[in-house]
């Protein structure tokens, strides 16, 4: 899968643009709710970081934010770093060209006040969701927030979302906001995709990151 080209679709595709707007709104609310002082942000499978970068650029808490973005694709990382420079965010952002499933990618950054897990849940199988939620517990600070997305009309999305919500509740997360929206054609002209964008608050205490074993396994390499 050419993820660099896939992300370019955000510039032309109305459905992706609308989803991005929702994600930015959820992130902005998390920043608004954050206590005074430093706001630590982690993004898992960050892409080019356009959800975080533009939100921070325009937000009143910009100076407080310290974001740690993890992305494996070097082209997307290069684009993200260039965007950081253009938005004068280099002092706020660490853009890491690393494997998001490797716990070593988050050393020194976790636990964070805001954890972004957007665009990656459709790449993991249902049986892998408990590991994803454990990763959330390791990455998120007490009273922090996790922002996540899931496409619902694809790969048993509704079933996955309900399973995720149940697992998160059992792990100490409470749902703060959920947006479920149906858009026009995404990449296929034969069906109308729908998306969930959720924010959960973590009321528990963060668990330790594993020493070396993968946080979770990505089983799919395409979104269509």
Could you describe each region identified by the protein language model?
Residues 1-36:
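Class I SAM-dependent methyltransferase Rossmann-like catalytic core
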Residues 48-63:
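Conserved SAM-binding loop of SAM-dependent methyltransferases across substrates and taxa
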Residues 73-75:
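Conserved SAM/SAH-binding beta-strand->alpha-helix loop
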Residues 112-128:
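A short SAM/SAH-binding and catalytic strip from SAM-dependent methyltransferases
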Residues 129-142:
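A short glycine-rich, Lys/Arg-flanked "PGG" loop and its adjoining helix->strand segment in the class I
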Residues 140-152:
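Conserved beta-strand signature within the Rossmann-like core of class I S-adenosyl-L-methionine
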Residues 158-160, 165-224:
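Class I S-adenosyl-L-methionine
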